[in-house]
């Protein structure tokens, strides 16, 4: 069944910030039919590009039940626990994931690359063996948002979603991820589909695709609980995602 929820806008607040600062984002979403159960929002920090063992759930928030219409709330979370991140992965590029579930079923996964680096030039040139956390800055790359959606059962009457294809377990390049907005399509085949949106989005594992990006970052080839105060205004229309200025 088609999704009953559309994520209209995610504004990353206080970006850039220091590594030890809280993550804070303002989320605006539309509900097309009344949802009797909570939406569960979860913010995850990917601590390593080689293993999920270092993923940290920074916080989660339950919002609901939710009437039809447009809603907004602010979700904040503490910074990741440094002791749970491999030392070699603290400085450099990481990934931040925002997931949303309904009835314990994940239906959207949004990911941003995060650049953690020193603001001091000398520390950049000669980074200490043990990272100085209080000197690290953090910038979420909002222009490089990646979105993956999944079919779920919104009601008991909905058909059971098909199992995920084994292809989803393979490592994907970043080009296989679906950007929320596509500013330009070079292929003729894509131009023919400008006015159409595919019914389903293939599941892509952001954690796995991060492997290549992390390796490139280390090689120097790339630089790169919730506050549930809801607002309901009944407005409609698309809003581009980005960070708040």
Curated annotation (Swiss-Prot):
Biased composition (Basic and acidic residues): 167-183, 215-245
Gene3D superfamilies: Histone chaperone ASF1-like
Any Pfam family the entry gives: ASF1_hist_chap
Entry GO CC: chromatin; nucleus
Keywords: Chaperone, Chromatin regulator, Nucleus, Transcription, Transcription regulation
InterPro entries: ASF1-like, ASF1-like_sf, Hist_deposition_Asf1
Bias kind Acidic residues: ranges: 157-166, 184-206
Gene Ontology BP terms: DNA replication; DNA replication-dependent chromatin assembly; nucleosome assembly; nucleosome disassembly; oogenesis; regulation of brood size; spermatogenesis
GO terms of molecular function: histone binding
First-listed, main subcellular location of the protein, grouped into a coarse class: nucleus
Region ranges (Disordered): 157-245
Subunit structure as annotated in this protein's UniProt entry: Interacts with histone H3 and histone H4.
Function (record text): Histone chaperone that facilitates histone deposition and histone exchange and removal during nucleosome assembly and disassembly.
Protein name according to UniProt: Probable histone chaperone asf-1-like protein
Organism the protein comes from: Caenorhabditis elegans
């Amino acid at each position: 069944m088609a999704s009953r929820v559309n994520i209209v806008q995610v504004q990353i607040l206080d970006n850039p910030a220091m590594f030890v600062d809280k993550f804070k984002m303002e989320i605006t979403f539309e509900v097309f039919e009344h949802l009797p159960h909570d939406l569960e929002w979860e913010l995850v920090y990917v601590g390593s590009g080689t293993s999920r063992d270092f993923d940290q759930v920074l916080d989660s928030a339950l919002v609901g039940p939710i009437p039809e219409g447009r809603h907004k709330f602010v979700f904040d979370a503490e910074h990741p626990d440094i002791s749970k991140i491999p030392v070699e992965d603290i400085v450099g590029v990481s990934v931040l994931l925002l997931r949303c579930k309904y009835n314990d079923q994940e239906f959207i996964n949004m990911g941003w690359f995060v650049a953690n680096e020193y603001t001091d030039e000398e520390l950049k040139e000669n980074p200490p063996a043990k990272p100085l956390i209080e000197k690290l800055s953090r910038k979420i790359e909002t222009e490089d948002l990646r979105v993956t959606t999944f079919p779920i059962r919104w009601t008991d009457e909905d058909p059971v979603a098909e199992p995920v294809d084994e292809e989803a377990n393979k490592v994907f390049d970043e080009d296989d991820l679906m950007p929320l907005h596509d500013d330009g399509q070079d292929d003729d085949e894509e131009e023919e589909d400008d006015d159409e949106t595919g019914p389903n989005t293939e599941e892509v594992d952001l954690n796995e695709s991060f492997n290549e990006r992390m390796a490139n970052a280390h090689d120097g080839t790339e630089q790169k609980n919730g506050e549930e105060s809801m607002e309901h205004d009944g407005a409609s229309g698309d809003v581009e995602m980005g960070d708040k200025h």
